[in-house]
Each structure stands twice: as C-alpha cells, then as structure tokens.
Amino acid sequence: CRLYPDFPWLYLQTDCRNAEFVPAPDWYYNFEYAREIERGYEGHEDLLTTGYFELPFRRGRSVVFSVSVEEIADPSTLGVMFAEALAARSLKVDFLSCLRHSARQFVVRRRDGRAEVLAGYPWYGQIGRQTLVALPGIALEQGRTEDCLDVLDTVVRERRDGMFTGSFSAAEAADAPLWFFWVLQRLQRTLGEEEIWKRYGTVMKELLAAYRRGVGGVAVHDNGLVWASAPDKALTWMNAVADGVPVVSRDGYPVEINALWYNAVC
C-alpha cells in the first residue's frame, strides 16, 4: 500500500501461507497531535488503514508479521529472519544491559547510508555538541568503533571552508568542533595515533585554522583565547533564546570553551 504518490510503498507480509488479506480501506484525515502542536511542530497528518489479515490459528503456533518499506522476496523465511534478529539483540536483564541496549538506538542511518546520532526521542534530531559528547559512551564503550567512525566521517564530509556545518559549526555552537578533538583522543586508544592522524589530521588542522581566522562571532584573539559573541545566538551550552535574544549572555572568553581549545591545541 502507499498513502500518496510521493510516498514509498509499505509492504505488509506474513510467513503464514494460508493467510488471506481482507481489503477494508479507510482514511482518517487531519489526525491531530496536541503535544506536537504545543511544541511548535507540525501536528496534523492523514492516517490510512488498508485492511486486515485472516488466517487459521491454533495453540502453540507462531506467526511472524512484517511491516517494511522493503519487500521480502520469500515471506516464508520471515520466521528465520526474526529469530536471527532476536538473537542479535542484547538481553535486557539488569540496569546496565538496558542502558547498553538503549545506547544503540541513538545511532541511526540516513537514507544515503550516512550515520548520525539523535539527541533524544521523540523530539530531537541531530545536534552537534550532543553528538560528540555522547559518541564515546554510546559507541566506543560498547565496542562499536565502526559506528563512531561512520558518525565522524559524516560530520567531516559535510564541512565547508575548513569548518563543520550546521549545528556542528562554531558559528552555531562555539565548542562543538572542539569536542571533535576530544572524541579523537578516545578513539586513539583503539586505532592508535598514526591511524587517527592519517584519517583526520587534515581536518584537525583546518578546524584550528578556522578558529584562528574567525567563524561567525567566534575567533582566537592575540592573547591565544577563544572569544565568543553573537547578539542573536547563545553560543555556549547555555543556549536558551527568547524573542531572538539569548537568555544568558556569555559574551567573552567562556571558560569551558577555552579549556576545550587548550585541549585541542596542546
């Protein structure tokens, strides 16, 4: 089924050969989500029900039902696919195992295959500072080095004039690119200094040069410290803005940003 022509097909499949799909299409137009509206998000969408499955069932029998934007060529293999997916999951038997399981859910893949970290469910997307602060914990400490590399490589590819873009840019968060160095220091324990320099040496030099050159309201002064100031943006972690004005103005040499700068250059 497909809601609209520009939407992907949605495949509803089961491993039960005797299952019969009963069409019973119906629309729910302009379904409203009050909380989304309260938070300033788009709060209406159309919902479609296409029908239901009827199948013979008996006690002790298992039936696997799949909902996906990708068609399963042989639905009879769904039982095996489900068992394999279940076996690959981490067991949730205590607080630590639940924490590890949850950590995996924050690294997601875009349609183009690139990886990113969601800042939180259900409201947030990718945020530069949160991504880099969290990455060692949700990836490296879980033994998921490839996830860490994939996220970093996504950030690195999307830089311009030596600086990261979007919420990873110093023009949006004065400290965000500096957390990149902090992540690399932890990644070095796994890959080694030579490999880190080979993969990211040019990027590190470009970032430091961009700070010295100045990006937005952020620049290194003659005294060697990072100055951050913008009339309409909160450039530190205290980033609340009301009516276009930062709630807490921290213009100057923020201590935590300069600590990260010192860490990056030394």
Predicted regions and their residues:
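Acidic, mature catalytic/reactive cores of soluble proteins
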Residues: 1-266
